[in-house]
Amino acid sequence: FGTPGRLTDHLDKGNFSAEHVKYLVIDEFDKCLEMGFQDEMGRLIASLPYLERHFLLSATEAEEIPRFVHMGRVETIDYRMDEEQVPERIRIYQVKSPQKDKLETLAQLLLSLGDESSIVFLNYRDSVERTNEFLRSRGFATSAFHGGLEQHEREDALYKFSNGSANIFVSTDLGARGLDIPDIDNIIHYHLPECEDSYIHRVGRTARWEATGKAFFLLGPSEDIPSYVDAEVEDYEIPSDLPAPAKPRMATIYIGKGKKDKISKGDIVGYLCKIGQLQSSEIGKIDVKDRYAYVAVSRTKLKQVLKLTAGQKIKGIKTVIEEVR
């Protein structure tokens, strides 16, 4: 399992032999093409001369298979179910903005949703950055996610949202597919989806595994609900009396050591309880990578943890411990 670039790097270094690799599965193949990964996929396929089968998994139907895949006879298997566009357990709303710039209306909508988890979808990277900065300036706990970020920045953003340190995820359509984040309450279309497939993938982030969810179209003065939306759309009235932005219960810290430094989840819990003086109930999700780790801790104890662990070693190793903002 790995990205095309990472797998090619392993092959170049001789970490495993291509001789015995008979099958290649590329997940989200259409999305890889859309994001410009043709060169990486082409190099990987060229590095695997003994392939007998290529499996290209896609949520959309390809007009043609790119030549670099070197496919022979192509057989298409369609597993899509003939079912309704959006499950009935998702309620669809429209919210009218009096201005073309909808940021103020977005802020009011998010205030009305309280501490519920929401993904705000936009169509452009710079729009994600602008919207995220605006919401943060208003006191919201957000994560920004798009393809222009470095890998570690995307990991930071995704981890904060998945562990509850940020309850608002501001993203391009990159966040509409391939992210395994359960229990998302709301989908907000700040920008209208560019096509029906985009709409379906966005809305599919909520109401998973029989849960319920809500999706909101944020409409400017000249915008209307797209014609491909076949569900009933209700008007959503934002209350006049709104609370302050909800602060998530957890915050995320970064620890600059990981698996290859012989650091385990148990080591981290012990360290934070002993040195950081936390109770185990004040520690949330822990994700240990090769060279670093993310940990969710109670937001009310964040300053305490950072102060008490400053300059302290974990398992006799010096490290950096800081908040992921």
What are these regions (language model features)?
Residues 128-134, 140-172:
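Conserved helicase ATPase core of P-loop NTP-dependent helicases/translocases
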Residues 168, 195-237:
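Conserved segment of the helicase C-terminal RecA-like domain
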Residues 4, 20, 27-29, 183, ...:
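Walker B catalytic acidic pair
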Residues 168, 177-192, 214-218:
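A short beta-strand element within the Helicase C-terminal
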Residues 1-11, 158-177:
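Conserved two-lobed SF2 helicase motor
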Residues 9-10, 15-84, 223, 228-231:
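Post-DEXD/H (motif II) to motif III coupling segment of the RecA-like Helicase ATP-binding lobe
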Residues 238-325:
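Non-catalytic terminal extensions of ATP-dependent helicases
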Residues 88-136:
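Conserved interdomain hinge at the start of the Helicase C-terminal
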